[in-house]
Amino acid sequence: MQTDSDTRIATVERKTKETNVFVSLDLDGNGEYDVDTGIGFLDHMLEQLSRHSLIDLKVRAQGDLHIDFHHTTEDTGIVIGEAVRKALGDFKGIRRYATAIIPMDETCTRVSIDVSQRPYLIWKVGFTKPKLGDMDTELFKEWFQAFAQNAGITLHIENMYGDNNHHIVESCFKGLARALRDAIEIDPRAANRIPSTKGVLGN
């Protein structure tokens, strides 16, 4: 893992017997992305995450896709989450809390986050089909769980209504992107302060 102390940039690589995942990101970017996980639909979702959060994101993942997509999906969430946490540094000045409500045609999803170093996921999302393309829909919860745990954020995702499974998933990723964009933004009125009366996050 490498972190630039003057800017909110991090690079993380994770190698196991199941996957090899590389992530480089810039929290203060322009939403530029270069993503290749070997899973087309996951790539599409990570591109949405980058574009709508304005986080510059590069992802390279190689995994045991001949078995299934589980390990690659989960490990990609792990490494992106870890990179976000590392890039945040001391967490000083961030707004910390944010909520985004994302409509997408017939679908509407609410995402709330607390960038607190207290990881937790509430997932109130259901699907009407077991797969989107070749990807099992149950894997999306695995991705968000891995991301929240390793980014150190409390993450609540609730699909309030919707019928189209693609729209439901995409609204979850876009909701995370918009909430993350707001929560990690530096508040100029509190730029050098930890956003907690305790003076520390995570305890």
Curated annotation (Swiss-Prot):
Coiled coil: none annotated. Gene3D superfamilies: Imidazole glycerol phosphate dehydratase, domain 1. Its main location: cytoplasm. One of its GO terms (cellular component) is cytoplasm. CDD domains: IGPD. Pathway: Amino-acid biosynthesis; L-histidine biosynthesis; L-histidine from 5-phospho-alpha-D-ribose 1-diphosphate: step 6/9. Disulfide bonds: none annotated. It is found in: Cytoplasm. One of its GO terms (molecular function) is imidazoleglycerol-phosphate dehydratase activity. InterPro entries: IGPD_sf (IPR038494), ImidazoleglycerolP_deHydtase (IPR000807), ImidazoleglycerP_deHydtase_CS (IPR020565), Ribosomal_Su5_D2-typ_SF (IPR020568). One of its GO terms (biological process) is L-histidine biosynthetic process. It comes from the Bacteria. It catalyses: D-erythro-1-(imidazol-4-yl)glycerol 3-phosphate = 3-(imidazol-4-yl)-2-oxopropyl phosphate + H2O. Its EC number is 4.2.1.19. Belongs to the imidazoleglycerol-phosphate dehydratase family. HAMAP family: HisB. This is Imidazoleglycerol-phosphate dehydratase. The gene is hisB.
